[in-house]
Regions:
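A short macromolecule-binding patch
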Residues: 42-54
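Short, structured beta-strand/loop micro-motifs enriched in basic residues and often containing a Trp
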Residues: 53-61
Length: 107
């Protein structure tokens, strides 16, 4: 997908990571939506991940709503990670605890 305002070069599109965690916040904002996810590590510590989505307009056309995920929801997120190794990425897909999948990139 071409983007008029910036590239997605910050993300490693050759990798897809899977993160299971609890939604801390979902920001339904322009120019991009953001999902803040708290992930539990095997040692019991937590990491907060910032996952960038497309615009509300694009996500809305894909079935998203501002309350598609809410704080406290347990979700699995598939993401292209940041190339820097920081805890962030580009959302590809979100799977709710009930197994419902919500795509985050147009097909």
């Amino acid at each position: 997908m071409a983007s008029a305002h910036h590239s997605f070069a910050a993300f490693d599109a050759t990798q897809v990571i899977t993160l299971k965690g609890t939604v801390k916040e979902f920001q339904w904002t322009n120019p991009h939506c953001w999902l803040q996810l708290v992930v539990m590590n095997p040692d019991g510590t937590t990491q907060e991940w910032s996952l960038e989505g497309l615009s509300p307009n694009v996500l809305g056309r894909m079935g998203w709503k501002r309350n598609s995920v809410v704080p406290g929801d347990v979700v699995t997120v598939y993401s292209n990670p940041l190339r820097t190794g920081a805890h962030g990425g580009n959302m590809i897909k979100v799977v709710r605890a009930d197994g419902t999948e919500i795509g985050a990139v147009p097909k």
